[in-house]
A protein has these predicted regions:
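A solvent-exposed, acidic/Ser-Thr-rich amphipathic alpha-helical stretch
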Residues: 4, 23-73, 83, 96-97
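Short, aromatic-enriched amphipathic alpha-helices that serve as compact interaction elements
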Residues: 3-21, 29
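A short hydrophobic beta-strand element
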Residues: 75-88
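Hydrophobic/aromatic beta-strand elements that line small-molecule binding cavities or substrate pockets
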Residues: 14, 65-71, 86, 101-107
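Short beta-strand edge/turn micro-motifs at domain boundaries
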Residues: 99-123
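A short, structured loop/turn motif at beta-sheet edges
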Residues: 71-78, 106-112
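Short, cysteine-centered beta-strand-loop-beta hairpins and adjacent loop/turn segments enriched
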Residues: 87-96
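Short beta-strand segments enriched in hydrophobic/aromatic residues
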Residues: 30, 84-86, 119-122
Length: 123
């Protein structure tokens, strides 16, 4: 598998794990220091995000991939932009579908890629 294929696979695995509430998969593919910057600007640490998925404060109901673009790989660092239609209930709100754009950052550690940072916006 090429580096490009590996980071695309990680992006897709994260989206699948969010919907399936596969917390062990999220823990495995996210760096311990991973931060998720939400559309509101709130910067959320990895374990808080996973906890909110576990407790249904953030319920991801579906995620439909529309585009992956701007893939950049430099040695052991990489990034991409993924665009998905995400249906979710967030922090007590109703069910909504967002055109969610994620700027994803990756690092290669011990020969394996891991997600290090994410920034959410809409497209």
């Amino acid at each position: 598998m090429t580096d490009q294929e590996a980071i695309i696979q990680l992006y897709r695995e994260e989206n699948e794990a969010m919907v399936a509430k596969n917390l062990s998969k999220l823990n495995q593919i996210l760096a311990p220091t991973m931060k998720l910057t939400h559309m509101t600007g709130y910067v959320q640490p990895k374990l808080e995000w996973i906890d909110q998925i576990q407790n249904d404060e953030m319920q991801y109901l579906s995620s439909k991939e529309e585009n992956i673009k701007d893939i950049e790989i430099y040695d052991n660092q990489a990034s991409l932009i993924g665009q998905n239609q995400v249906q979710a209930k967030i922090w007590g709100g109703g069910v909504n579908t967002w055109p969610l754009q994620m700027k994803m950052y990756f690092a290669k550690q011990n020969g394996n890629w891991i997600i290090t940072n994410q920034v959410a916006s809409t497209y």
